[in-house]
A protein has these predicted regions:
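Bacterial N-terminal signal peptides that target proteins for export
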Residues: 2-11
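Short linear, low-complexity motifs centered on an aromatic residue
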Residues: 6, 22-25
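Bacterial N-terminal signal peptides
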Residues: 11-19
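Mid-to-C-terminal functional-domain signal that highlights helix-capping/loop sites
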Residues: 24-322
Length: 322
Protein backbone atom coordinates (compact mmCIF):
# COMPACT_ATOMS: atom_id res chain seq x y z
CA UNK A 1 0.00 0.00 0.00
CA UNK A 2 1.40 3.41 -0.99
CA UNK A 3 1.48 6.19 1.64
CA UNK A 4 -0.78 4.17 3.93
CA UNK A 5 -0.55 6.69 6.84
CA UNK A 6 -1.77 9.43 4.51
CA UNK A 7 -4.52 7.21 3.18
CA UNK A 8 -5.56 6.34 6.73
CA UNK A 9 -5.63 9.98 7.75
CA UNK A 10 -7.66 10.85 4.67
CA UNK A 11 -10.07 8.01 5.34
CA UNK A 12 -10.41 9.04 8.99
CA UNK A 13 -11.07 12.65 8.01
CA UNK A 14 -13.70 11.48 5.54
CA UNK A 15 -15.39 9.35 8.20
CA UNK A 16 -15.39 12.23 10.71
CA UNK A 17 -16.85 14.56 8.09
CA UNK A 18 -19.63 12.10 7.29
CA UNK A 19 -20.35 11.54 10.99
CA UNK A 20 -20.45 15.29 11.63
CA UNK A 21 -22.81 15.81 8.70
CA UNK A 22 -24.99 12.95 9.90
CA UNK A 23 -25.07 14.37 13.43
CA UNK A 24 -25.98 17.81 12.10
CA UNK A 25 -28.70 16.32 9.93
CA UNK A 26 -30.04 14.31 12.86
CA UNK A 27 -30.10 17.42 15.03
CA UNK A 28 -32.13 19.19 12.35
CA UNK A 29 -34.81 16.50 12.47
CA UNK A 30 -37.08 16.21 15.50
CA UNK A 31 -39.66 13.45 15.72
CA UNK A 32 -39.54 13.19 11.94
CA UNK A 33 -39.89 16.95 11.30
CA UNK A 34 -37.24 19.06 9.61
CA UNK A 35 -36.50 22.02 11.90
CA UNK A 36 -33.32 23.19 10.17
CA UNK A 37 -35.03 26.41 9.08
CA UNK A 38 -36.97 27.02 12.31
CA UNK A 39 -37.82 30.56 13.40
CA UNK A 40 -36.92 29.59 16.98
CA UNK A 41 -33.68 28.07 18.32
CA UNK A 42 -33.76 24.34 17.67
CA UNK A 43 -32.32 23.66 21.13
CA UNK A 44 -35.55 25.11 22.55
CA UNK A 45 -37.72 22.61 20.68
CA UNK A 46 -38.26 19.60 22.93
CA UNK A 47 -39.62 16.14 22.35
CA UNK A 48 -42.62 15.56 24.60
CA UNK A 49 -42.09 11.82 24.91
CA UNK A 50 -44.62 10.65 22.31
CA UNK A 51 -44.28 9.90 18.63
CA UNK A 52 -45.98 11.98 15.96
CA UNK A 53 -49.74 11.47 16.36
CA UNK A 54 -49.09 9.52 19.55
CA UNK A 55 -51.67 11.95 20.91
CA UNK A 56 -54.32 11.41 18.23
CA UNK A 57 -56.30 14.31 16.82
CA UNK A 58 -60.05 13.88 16.44
CA UNK A 59 -60.94 14.18 12.77
CA UNK A 60 -64.56 13.00 12.85
CA UNK A 61 -66.03 14.61 15.97
CA UNK A 62 -69.42 13.47 17.22
CA UNK A 63 -71.67 15.74 19.25
CA UNK A 64 -74.62 15.28 21.57
CA UNK A 65 -77.34 17.62 22.77
CA UNK A 66 -76.90 19.26 26.19
CA UNK A 67 -79.63 16.98 27.54
CA UNK A 68 -77.54 13.94 26.64
CA UNK A 69 -74.27 15.36 27.98
CA UNK A 70 -74.72 13.62 31.34
CA UNK A 71 -70.96 13.06 31.53
CA UNK A 72 -70.50 16.79 32.19
CA UNK A 73 -70.97 18.42 35.58
CA UNK A 74 -71.63 22.11 36.09
CA UNK A 75 -68.05 22.87 37.10
CA UNK A 76 -66.34 20.82 34.41
CA UNK A 77 -64.33 23.04 32.12
CA UNK A 78 -64.95 23.27 28.41
CA UNK A 79 -63.68 25.15 25.41
CA UNK A 80 -66.73 26.94 24.04
CA UNK A 81 -66.84 28.15 20.46
CA UNK A 82 -69.67 30.20 18.93
CA UNK A 83 -69.03 30.61 15.22
CA UNK A 84 -71.23 31.03 12.15
CA UNK A 85 -74.27 30.99 14.42
CA UNK A 86 -73.36 27.59 15.89
CA UNK A 87 -72.34 26.89 19.50
CA UNK A 88 -70.20 23.90 20.45
CA UNK A 89 -68.53 22.84 23.68
CA UNK A 90 -65.37 20.75 23.80
CA UNK A 91 -64.85 19.23 27.26
CA UNK A 92 -61.34 19.66 28.63
CA UNK A 93 -61.43 16.05 29.85
CA UNK A 94 -61.53 15.04 26.17
CA UNK A 95 -59.19 17.74 24.88
CA UNK A 96 -56.50 16.67 27.37
CA UNK A 97 -56.34 13.29 25.64
CA UNK A 98 -56.37 14.57 22.04
CA UNK A 99 -55.30 18.25 22.02
CA UNK A 100 -56.65 18.75 18.48
CA UNK A 101 -60.14 18.52 16.98
CA UNK A 102 -60.52 19.18 13.26
CA UNK A 103 -64.10 20.32 12.87
CA UNK A 104 -66.49 22.32 10.71
CA UNK A 105 -68.94 25.11 11.51
CA UNK A 106 -71.58 25.37 8.81
CA UNK A 107 -69.08 23.99 6.32
CA UNK A 108 -66.16 26.17 7.40
CA UNK A 109 -63.10 24.24 8.55
CA UNK A 110 -61.78 25.11 12.00
CA UNK A 111 -59.32 23.43 14.35
CA UNK A 112 -59.85 23.47 18.11
CA UNK A 113 -56.64 23.03 20.11
CA UNK A 114 -55.65 22.61 23.74
CA UNK A 115 -52.26 22.43 25.43
CA UNK A 116 -52.47 20.89 28.94
CA UNK A 117 -49.00 22.11 29.90
CA UNK A 118 -49.95 25.74 29.24
CA UNK A 119 -53.70 25.54 30.00
CA UNK A 120 -54.23 27.21 26.63
CA UNK A 121 -57.29 26.52 24.48
CA UNK A 122 -57.37 28.19 21.06
CA UNK A 123 -59.46 27.74 17.92
CA UNK A 124 -58.27 28.59 14.42
CA UNK A 125 -59.81 29.27 11.03
CA UNK A 126 -58.08 26.61 8.95
CA UNK A 127 -59.68 27.44 5.63
CA UNK A 128 -57.72 30.48 4.53
CA UNK A 129 -55.32 31.54 1.79
CA UNK A 130 -53.25 28.39 2.30
CA UNK A 131 -56.21 26.18 1.49
CA UNK A 132 -57.88 23.80 3.89
CA UNK A 133 -55.37 22.72 6.53
CA UNK A 134 -55.95 19.84 8.91
CA UNK A 135 -53.75 19.45 11.95
CA UNK A 136 -52.18 16.78 14.08
CA UNK A 137 -50.02 16.68 17.21
CA UNK A 138 -46.30 16.62 16.38
CA UNK A 139 -45.12 15.37 19.77
CA UNK A 140 -42.86 18.42 20.00
CA UNK A 141 -43.09 21.46 22.26
CA UNK A 142 -41.74 25.00 22.29
CA UNK A 143 -41.96 26.95 25.54
CA UNK A 144 -43.92 23.93 26.86
CA UNK A 145 -46.60 24.73 24.28
CA UNK A 146 -47.84 22.17 21.78
CA UNK A 147 -46.39 22.32 18.29
CA UNK A 148 -49.06 21.34 15.81
CA UNK A 149 -48.31 20.21 12.29
CA UNK A 150 -50.44 20.58 9.20
CA UNK A 151 -50.86 17.39 7.21
CA UNK A 152 -50.70 19.20 3.89
CA UNK A 153 -47.12 20.55 4.16
CA UNK A 154 -45.87 19.11 7.49
CA UNK A 155 -45.02 22.62 8.66
CA UNK A 156 -44.81 23.00 12.44
CA UNK A 157 -47.14 25.55 14.04
CA UNK A 158 -46.85 27.14 17.46
CA UNK A 159 -50.27 27.32 19.09
CA UNK A 160 -49.78 30.41 21.29
CA UNK A 161 -47.58 32.14 18.72
CA UNK A 162 -50.27 31.40 16.06
CA UNK A 163 -47.53 30.95 13.49
CA UNK A 164 -45.73 28.29 11.49
CA UNK A 165 -42.18 28.11 12.84
CA UNK A 166 -40.72 25.70 10.28
CA UNK A 167 -41.48 24.01 7.00
CA UNK A 168 -42.98 25.15 3.74
CA UNK A 169 -45.34 27.61 5.45
CA UNK A 170 -42.73 29.01 7.85
CA UNK A 171 -43.72 32.51 8.98
CA UNK A 172 -47.37 32.11 7.98
CA UNK A 173 -50.01 33.16 10.48
CA UNK A 174 -53.24 31.40 11.31
CA UNK A 175 -56.33 33.36 12.35
CA UNK A 176 -57.68 32.66 15.85
CA UNK A 177 -61.40 32.47 16.59
CA UNK A 178 -62.81 33.59 19.98
CA UNK A 179 -62.74 30.63 22.35
CA UNK A 180 -64.15 30.51 25.88
CA UNK A 181 -62.20 28.48 28.43
CA UNK A 182 -64.95 28.31 31.03
CA UNK A 183 -67.23 26.00 33.00
CA UNK A 184 -69.97 23.98 31.40
CA UNK A 185 -72.62 25.78 33.45
CA UNK A 186 -71.36 29.22 32.41
CA UNK A 187 -71.15 28.28 28.74
CA UNK A 188 -74.59 26.66 28.80
CA UNK A 189 -76.10 29.73 30.47
CA UNK A 190 -75.06 31.81 27.45
CA UNK A 191 -75.61 29.11 24.84
CA UNK A 192 -78.34 26.75 26.08
CA UNK A 193 -78.56 25.01 22.69
CA UNK A 194 -74.83 24.30 22.47
CA UNK A 195 -73.96 20.79 21.38
CA UNK A 196 -71.17 18.93 23.19
CA UNK A 197 -68.28 16.86 21.90
CA UNK A 198 -69.08 13.33 23.00
CA UNK A 199 -66.97 10.51 24.37
CA UNK A 200 -67.68 8.70 21.10
CA UNK A 201 -64.35 9.79 19.61
CA UNK A 202 -63.33 6.57 17.92
CA UNK A 203 -60.57 6.06 20.48
CA UNK A 204 -60.46 4.11 23.72
CA UNK A 205 -59.50 6.61 26.39
CA UNK A 206 -60.37 7.08 30.07
CA UNK A 207 -61.77 10.57 29.76
CA UNK A 208 -62.58 10.83 33.45
CA UNK A 209 -58.93 10.62 34.51
CA UNK A 210 -56.90 13.80 34.90
CA UNK A 211 -53.35 12.68 34.18
CA UNK A 212 -52.10 16.25 34.54
CA UNK A 213 -53.29 16.73 38.12
CA UNK A 214 -49.82 16.45 39.68
CA UNK A 215 -48.37 18.80 37.09
CA UNK A 216 -51.10 21.37 37.68
CA UNK A 217 -50.40 21.36 41.42
CA UNK A 218 -46.64 21.49 41.04
CA UNK A 219 -44.63 24.68 40.65
CA UNK A 220 -42.32 22.96 38.22
CA UNK A 221 -42.38 23.11 34.43
CA UNK A 222 -41.78 20.13 32.19
CA UNK A 223 -39.26 21.91 29.96
CA UNK A 224 -37.23 25.14 29.94
CA UNK A 225 -38.74 28.32 28.47
CA UNK A 226 -37.10 31.15 26.56
CA UNK A 227 -38.26 33.95 28.89
CA UNK A 228 -39.05 33.82 32.60
CA UNK A 229 -40.74 36.16 35.08
CA UNK A 230 -41.32 35.79 38.81
CA UNK A 231 -43.89 38.59 38.88
CA UNK A 232 -46.69 36.05 39.36
CA UNK A 233 -46.66 32.32 40.17
CA UNK A 234 -45.77 30.33 37.07
CA UNK A 235 -49.11 28.55 36.81
CA UNK A 236 -51.36 31.39 37.87
CA UNK A 237 -53.98 32.05 35.21
CA UNK A 238 -54.13 35.11 33.01
CA UNK A 239 -56.17 36.35 30.08
CA UNK A 240 -53.89 37.23 27.19
CA UNK A 241 -54.82 39.26 24.12
CA UNK A 242 -52.99 40.56 21.07
CA UNK A 243 -54.35 43.71 19.44
CA UNK A 244 -52.55 45.18 16.43
CA UNK A 245 -49.34 43.38 17.46
CA UNK A 246 -49.52 44.81 20.97
CA UNK A 247 -49.99 42.27 23.75
CA UNK A 248 -51.65 42.71 27.11
CA UNK A 249 -52.44 40.30 29.89
CA UNK A 250 -55.01 40.39 32.66
CA UNK A 251 -53.81 38.24 35.58
CA UNK A 252 -56.73 36.68 37.43
CA UNK A 253 -55.08 37.84 40.66
CA UNK A 254 -55.37 41.45 39.48
CA UNK A 255 -58.94 40.94 38.28
CA UNK A 256 -59.92 39.60 41.71
CA UNK A 257 -58.34 42.58 43.43
CA UNK A 258 -59.97 44.99 41.00
CA UNK A 259 -63.33 43.56 42.00
CA UNK A 260 -65.41 44.61 38.98
CA UNK A 261 -67.18 42.03 36.85
CA UNK A 262 -67.29 44.46 33.92
CA UNK A 263 -65.02 47.42 33.27
CA UNK A 264 -63.43 49.36 30.44
CA UNK A 265 -59.71 49.30 29.77
CA UNK A 266 -57.85 51.39 27.20
CA UNK A 267 -55.26 49.92 24.83
CA UNK A 268 -53.63 52.28 22.33
CA UNK A 269 -56.25 54.93 23.08
CA UNK A 270 -59.08 52.54 22.23
CA UNK A 271 -61.65 51.32 24.79
CA UNK A 272 -62.20 47.63 25.41
CA UNK A 273 -64.64 45.99 27.78
CA UNK A 274 -63.38 43.27 30.09
CA UNK A 275 -65.87 40.75 31.47
CA UNK A 276 -64.64 38.90 34.54
CA UNK A 277 -66.43 35.97 36.19
CA UNK A 278 -64.59 35.06 39.37
CA UNK A 279 -66.81 32.12 40.30
CA UNK A 280 -66.22 30.38 36.99
CA UNK A 281 -62.64 31.67 36.58
CA UNK A 282 -63.38 33.08 33.17
CA UNK A 283 -62.62 36.35 31.43
CA UNK A 284 -63.09 37.77 27.94
CA UNK A 285 -62.53 41.03 26.10
CA UNK A 286 -64.86 42.92 23.72
CA UNK A 287 -64.22 45.84 21.41
CA UNK A 288 -66.24 49.07 21.28
CA UNK A 289 -68.76 47.42 18.92
CA UNK A 290 -69.41 44.64 21.41
CA UNK A 291 -67.59 41.99 19.39
CA UNK A 292 -65.60 39.45 21.36
CA UNK A 293 -61.92 39.42 20.46
CA UNK A 294 -59.78 36.29 20.21
CA UNK A 295 -57.92 35.84 23.48
CA UNK A 296 -56.53 32.98 25.52
CA UNK A 297 -56.70 31.96 29.16
CA UNK A 298 -53.27 30.58 29.87
CA UNK A 299 -50.66 30.09 32.57
CA UNK A 300 -48.60 33.19 33.30
CA UNK A 301 -45.29 31.46 32.53
CA UNK A 302 -46.46 30.52 29.04
CA UNK A 303 -47.83 33.94 28.13
CA UNK A 304 -44.65 35.64 29.32
CA UNK A 305 -42.41 33.09 27.57
CA UNK A 306 -43.94 34.10 24.25
CA UNK A 307 -44.60 37.76 25.07
CA UNK A 308 -41.97 39.21 27.43
CA UNK A 309 -42.91 42.66 26.12
CA UNK A 310 -46.52 42.28 27.28
CA UNK A 311 -48.41 45.04 29.01
CA UNK A 312 -49.85 43.89 32.34
CA UNK A 313 -53.13 45.05 33.82
CA UNK A 314 -52.71 46.10 37.46
CA UNK A 315 -55.68 46.48 39.78
CA UNK A 316 -54.19 49.30 41.84
CA UNK A 317 -53.27 51.40 38.82
CA UNK A 318 -56.72 50.84 37.30
CA UNK A 319 -58.43 52.02 40.50
CA UNK A 320 -56.52 55.29 40.36
CA UNK A 321 -57.71 55.96 36.81
CA UNK A 322 -61.41 55.45 37.50
Amino acid sequence: MVNSPIVCRFFMALVLTVLAATALKADDVRNGFDVSDALVPTNEIFWGGVRRDGIPAIDAPNFVSPEKAKFLRDWDRVLGVFHNGIAKAYPIKIMEKHEVVNDRFDGQAVTVTYCPLCFSGMTFDTQGKYGHLSFGVSGLLYNNDVLLYDRQTESLWSQIRTQAISGQLKGARIAPIPTAHTTWREWQSRHPQSVVLSFDTGFRRRYGDNVYEDYQRSRDLMFPVSNRSSRYPKKSKVLGVTIDRKTKTYPFKELREHGSSTFVDVIDDKPYTIHWNEEDEYARILNADGDELPSVIVYWFAWYAFHPETLVFEAESAKHTR
